[in-house]
From Swiss-Prot:
Glycans are attached at N103. Residues 239-263 are annotated as: Disordered. Residues 19-163 are extracellular. The lineage of its organism: Eukaryota, Metazoa, Chordata, Craniata, Vertebrata. It is found in: Cell membrane. Residues 24-99 form the Kringle domain. Residues 185-263 are cytoplasmic. It is a single-pass type I membrane protein. This is Phosphoinositide-3-kinase-interacting protein 1. It comes from Danio rerio. One of its GO terms (cellular component) is extracellular space. Disulfide bonds join C25-C99, C46-C80, C69-C94. One of its GO terms (molecular function) is endopeptidase activity.
Amino acid sequence: MFGRLYFMLLLSVGLVDCLSVVKDCITNNGEDYRGTQQKTSSGSTCLSWRSLNLKFKDSQTGVGDHNFCRNPDGSNKPWCYVSGSSGETKKEACDIRICQDQNATEAPAPEESVPTQGLTQRMVETFEPANSFPSQVEGAAVQPVKGVRQQVRSGPKKKKDLGTLGYVLAVFMMAIIILLGGGITMGYFYKRGRDLKKQHEQRVYEREMHRITLPLSAFANPTCELVDENTIVITAEPNNQTPTQEPVEGADPLMGSAGTPGA
């Protein structure tokens, strides 16, 4: 029973492989195409890849000892080398249909489609004749032709994102710069105000010391002395009467006109 199951499993795997080989259509630009198409769009028969002394990795590009159309360099469609009218070797694109089960959103752009009757400059490239390659460099690798994908990769590189840590460090540095600037400004104004206060206190102290150290003559006022002498004379004048003087009648406020005391 297990032998029958194993045989059925092998048979199903073989059928799947056969169907994948028979499937002669491409998806996208046909880099994974492994069909048996041997003619180009112009009807020319492809040359064998080994006869051109080209070295490609068969496991990745599908190039080997055959003349089937392949796309080892990422071109728009599968292609192969053919012999020109003058004996030169040139590259031509193959006319292979697109798989019908492909999603419409993944269909190639219109500018990438290749007409079946004409050949553009990108599809046809002239190379040296195959017999011009020296036999001693049979295994030498030839640089593949750059396609659309290689041209896109050579564009400007995207700037590296600093990330959250980079932005945090930038904000931290800006805050430090702002704090330093504010501290320097406040320190300048504080020192300036303290110097002005010291100058004012010094002026007040100098004026006070100058007033204290003045001589006594600076406080002498002749007018003030004259007034003081007059006052002293007036208050110090004796009120003595001579024996010849008699009090005037009625001059004493305690005496009445009749001479009666208390009147």
